[in-house]
Amino acid sequence: MGSLVRLLKELYVPGKDICISPRGVYTILMNIMIGCKKETRDKIKDLLGIFGNYVPIPDKSEYYVEYYDDKDELINKSIMLIEEGYPIKRDFINSSYDIFNAKVVSFTDDTISETINKWVELSTRGLIKDFSISLADDIRLAIINVLYFKSKWKYPFDTELTSKHPFKKYNGTDVMIDTMMIQDVAFYYKHDEDIRSQVVMLEYEDYRFVMFIIIPDSVTGIDGVVDSLNNGKNINKIISKKDMTLKEIVLYLPKFELEDDVDLKDALIHMGCNDLFKSGELVGISDTKTLRIGNIRQKSVIKVDEYGTEAASVTESCTTDGIKKIPIVKANVPFMFLVADVQTKIPLFLGIFQG
């Protein structure tokens, strides 16, 4: 599911909600990578889980998506802001458009922020309305990626069964929150002894997308789940469908909406991409030696209710004795969620709900 899940470990603060889009970060880094020196490009490859001399031939369909039907909506697109008159290489502009469909917009002052804010709001169907971008005097180039996802559950929750239930927060206090309930449905389910958590897979109407809920056995068990996110292999093992059993359960899941705005610079530096933010590394973007990346920022919003999931990000997821016993699974402690795109194997959204 991708090495970028490690970002969650870098950004994790006990007791604090978090939501990021690995797919959005992946798109931005792949775009930047085509303009980097070999050494910096190799470090980005390591971060993205691309090993050896192999570099995947980018497929435009992976990075520029406007996918609609009566079940799902997925939008992934980019825009590139270039200071008017600044010498950006034409090859980089062309490649960014050909692969990522990144539209190029010239700017002369900070008035461009209103235009970008409207573009983000329209692209995310109004889910993100206040994406402010401040183009300081030393900003020459900005690449903005938008990812929007909306999908209906294969098995929707009955709104009549939603009610207030206690949720135990990380600090041990209880809060009453709106909690959905579904029964008489079989979900892929397992108890993972390594991370001491229950794992449930919820399917959307379009089988391309799924959501995994990882519910620790204890209130602070989320720490152990986060600690396990050392690389993509670990998360792949945790959410491996082949290790799960299709089982009828009674599931209690909070309705929730999270909004997060994070600067990814320190996390990416700690993960080995420090050269990315140094001058002189972006030789494929401009001959100017002083050009560097100031920061990589992402704003994400996710909404989960009885009908399905709506999410967006902007970047600058037995029987015994003949009597059937149905497990009751309650997501009533801090838990992790992951929205996965089965087709690309890259998580769309990943986060932790803390109540």
Curated annotation (Swiss-Prot):
Specify the protein name: Uncharacterized serpin-like protein FPV010
Domain of life of the source: Viruses
Q: Name one Pfam family in it.
A: Serpin
Q: Which UniProt keywords apply?
A: Protease inhibitor, Serine protease inhibitor
Q: Which family does it belong to?
A: Belongs to the serpin family. Poxviruses subfamily.
User: What's a Gene Ontology MF term here?
Assistant: serine-type endopeptidase inhibitor activity
Q: Which GO cellular component terms, listed alphabetically, does the Swiss-Prot or TrEMBL entry include?
A: extracellular space
Does the keyword Mitochondrion feature in the UniProt annotation?
no
